[in-house]
């Protein structure tokens, strides 16, 4: 068969030979492009605002599963098997309201849903942030801060000085109880943006999510403190 294929191409012009190659191998290309890789991801969900009536499909052919969200903690753990993006839908309208593309290297994810503002009339309602939630990235006894506040923040975590970058900051070891005080500069004035205390039990870790102020013009950021034990249920 290989000799016959070479003879066919040799007897044609260069341009025709290229067309013949495309025709011969096109079915393989189409099949490769139409079959995206399946991923297996375990994940939890947190919404920056109260949300209900959300579902997702764990696997092709299965019924939609409701997502149970907590106001101050990660949701229960769910599992997804399929191609990306992972889609979250409205239970009533069945429309897709959030999408998450989880990188291949992440198998334990935290999905943070932040409502789009202003709220769109149709289409996606949330911006979705995907975080590596594995114990490898953040071990017990540490605090990570996700700065989505829109401010440049600096201050102290316990007795350690810190300056936060935008996005997810590296985890830092903390004592069982650590005060967190963060400030920002507005019009040459240093203003307190956040103050709180993180208290951990043995084997726990914390993620502090900082969001833009609720009131326009305020320097006080909104916050969500999420405490859990890696690989186990969350603590409300």
Model-derived segments and spans:
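Intrinsically disordered, compositionally biased low-complexity segments in eukaryotic proteins
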Residues: 2-4
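N-terminal export leaders
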Residues: 8-9
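Bacterial N-terminal signal peptides
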Residues: 13-27
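Intrinsically disordered, low-complexity polar regions and short flexible loop motifs
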Residues: 32-236
């Amino acid at each position: 068969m290989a000799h016959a294929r070479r003879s066919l191409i040799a007897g044609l012009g260069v341009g025709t030979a290229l067309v013949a190659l495309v025709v011969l191998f096109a079915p393989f290309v189409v099949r490769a492009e139409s079959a995206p890789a399946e991923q297996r991801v375990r994940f939890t969900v947190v919404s920056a605002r109260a949300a209900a009536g959300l579902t997702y499909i764990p696997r092709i052919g299965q019924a939609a599963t409701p997502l149970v969200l907590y106001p101050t903690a990660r949701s229960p753990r769910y599992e997804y098997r399929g191609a990306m993006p992972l889609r979250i839908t409205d239970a009533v309208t069945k429309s897709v309201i959030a999408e998450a593309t989880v990188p291949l290297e992440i198998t334990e994810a935290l999905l943070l849903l932040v409502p789009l503002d202003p709220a769109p009339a149709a289409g996606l309602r949330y911006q979705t942030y995907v975080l590596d939630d594995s114990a490898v990235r953040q071990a017990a006894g540490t605090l990570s801060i996700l700065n989505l506040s829109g401010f440049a923040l600096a201050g102290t975590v316990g007795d350690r000085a810190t300056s936060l970058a935008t996005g997810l900051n590296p985890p830092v070891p903390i004592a069982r109880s650590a005060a967190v005080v963060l400030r920002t500069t507005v019009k040459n004035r240093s203003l307190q943006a956040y103050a709180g205390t993180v208290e951990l039990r043995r084997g726990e870790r914390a993620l502090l999510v900082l969001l833009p102020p609720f009131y326009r013009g305020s320097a006080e950021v909104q916050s969500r403190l999420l405490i859990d034990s890696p690989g186990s249920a969350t603590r409300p």
